[in-house]
């Protein structure tokens, strides 16, 4: 009898370990009623699993709903992932970015986002045909997407528009770049305003894109991004961006 059970047990163990079925088998750790909607919208039919290796950190309560820092650490997938998505489930524009690591991008970054109301925040990392999902919940008074920011209320906003500040630091296994771009990042959700936001970001090495991001208007005004790249201190990077009005920005990272 034992001889017949061994093959059956082996098949059952393989089936239970398969990442393709864990999305349905696992309970949503954030217990969000919007999870299934955005799983289908952003992740499609690709297998999905909740994974503690995708670590998402944010303040438990957002004191400034227009500037909420999100830290993502999925270093376990460094060199073995093809895309990363970040979305805020209850924002009117839920998707924040679509990150493609290409040759140099690593799965460790931070960015400031808008928060319209208390919400679950998700990060999905595509690795070897499976979406690995982590997340957290942020409470807040909200209004970050529909309240005017300060960028255009200051007299000097047009003077500073497009100004870039960038630095690079040693950070194993490569280097950490920090970039701040002066831009209003208007969502178009405020009456009498049109969408005006950065939509494409790239880190350039040796004249070629080394990592890229597609942004949405849920990124905070005067966006700040920190990203770990493979290149060490000898690598030469440029930061390039383009907004939806065709303005282009270019800056060498020292």
Tell me the role of every PLM-derived stretch.
Residues 102-110, 217-228:
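Aromatic sugar-binding surface patches on proteins
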């Amino acid at each position: 009898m034992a001889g017949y059970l061994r093959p059956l047990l082996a098949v059952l163990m393989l089936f239970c370990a398969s990442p393709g079925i864990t999305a349905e088998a696992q309970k949503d750790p954030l217990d969000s009623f919007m999870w299934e909607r955005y799983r289908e919208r952003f992740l499609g039919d690709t297998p999905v699993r909740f994974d503690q290796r995708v670590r998402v950190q944010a303040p438990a309560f957002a004191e400034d709903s227009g500037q909420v820092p999100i830290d993502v650490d999925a270093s376990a997938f460094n060199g073995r992932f093809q895309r990363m998505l970040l979305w805020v489930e209850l924002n009117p524009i839920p998707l924040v970015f679509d990150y493609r690591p290409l040759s140099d991008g690593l799965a460790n970054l931070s960015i400031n986002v808008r928060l319209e109301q208390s919400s679950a925040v998700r990060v999905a990392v595509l690795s070897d045909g499976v979406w690995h999902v982590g997340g957290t919940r942020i409470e807040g008074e909200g209004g970050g997407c529909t309240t005017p920011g300060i960028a255009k209320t200051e007299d000097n906003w047009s003077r500073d528009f497009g100004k870039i500040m960038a630095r690079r630091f040693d950070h194993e296994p490569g280097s950490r770049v920090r970039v701040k771009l002066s831009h209003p990042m208007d969502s178009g959700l405020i009456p009498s305003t049109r969408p005006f936001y950065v939509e494409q970001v790239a880190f350039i090495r040796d004249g070629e894109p080394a990592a890229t991001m597609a942004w949405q208007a849920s990124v905070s005004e005067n966006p700040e991004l920190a990203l770990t790249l493979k290149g060490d201190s000898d690598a030469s990077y440029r930061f390039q961006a383009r907004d939806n009005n065709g303005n282009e920005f270019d800056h060498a990272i020292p």
